[in-house]
């Protein structure tokens, strides 16, 4: 699980765990992009997917530099990560974004832990900070969109209610 990422003793293992997490995220974004209806959200999710692909490209040579073999495929978690999005698609865009938010919560936590380590070489830390900043931006966008969906839902509920009688008028029951 992503909640374990950042706790690895070895830096190469840490970076490989982040690569797996980003590969999982790419798969989840592919599933979300296929299923989401809103064109703006679809485009934004495409940009976020590209960020995760860049994370993999940036982290991979760092693992090699540390003398280890970089992972090249998503972890088994991808089934769970992608599955949240597939199931959410049954109920629409808002739930797809909610599923993606849980995924972004995981990646944010993982990158926060990785950046917080004091044994990470400075050139590796620079990459981790850049990736973490991307993750924060992804989550902020998704949270904003979820808030907008909630506001629209509230507005619709209010507009469908019967208006109150004018002040001073007898109420009819």
Residue ranges and their predicted role:
Residues 2-12, 86-93, 145-157:
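Membrane-interacting alpha-helical segments
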Residues 2-37, 94-119:
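Alpha-helical bundle segments that constitute or directly flank the non-heme di-iron/ferroxidase center
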Residues 2-4, 10, 24, 47-50, ...:
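Long, non-catalytic architectural segments outside compact domain cores
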Residues 9-18, 37-57, 93-99, 122-134:
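Alpha-helical scaffold segments that form or flank carboxylate-/histidine-based iron centers
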Residues 28, 58, 62, 86, ...:
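Solvent-exposed, charged/polar functional surfaces in cytosolic regulatory/catalytic domains
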Residues 40-76, 138-149:
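Conserved alpha-helical segments that form or flank metal/cofactor-binding pockets of metalloenzymes
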Residues 57, 61-108:
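Carboxylate-rich helix-loop segments that flank metal/cofactor sites and access channels
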Residues 103-173:
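Preference for long, well-ordered alpha-helical segments
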């Amino acid at each position: 699980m992503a909640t374990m990422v950042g706790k690895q003793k070895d830096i190469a293992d840490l970076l490989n765990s982040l690569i797996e997490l980003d590969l999982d995220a790419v798969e989840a974004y592919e599933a979300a992009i296929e299923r989401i209806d809103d064109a703006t959200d679809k485009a934004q999710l495409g940009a976020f997917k590209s960020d995760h692909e860049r994370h993999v490209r940036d982290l991979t040579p760092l693992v090699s530099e540390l003398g280890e073999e970089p992972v090249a495929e998503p972890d088994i978690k991808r089934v769970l990560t992608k599955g949240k999005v597939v199931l959410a698609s049954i109920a629409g865009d808002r739930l797809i974004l909610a599923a993606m938010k849980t995924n972004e919560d995981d990646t944010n936590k993982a990158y926060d832990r990785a950046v917080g380590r004091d044994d990470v070489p400075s050139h590796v830390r620079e990459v981790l900070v850049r990736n973490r900043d991307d993750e924060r931006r992804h989550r902020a966008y998704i949270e904003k969109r979820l808030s907008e969906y909630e506001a629209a839902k509230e507005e619709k509920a209010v507009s469908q209610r019967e208006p109150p009688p004018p002040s001073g008028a007898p109420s009819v029951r």
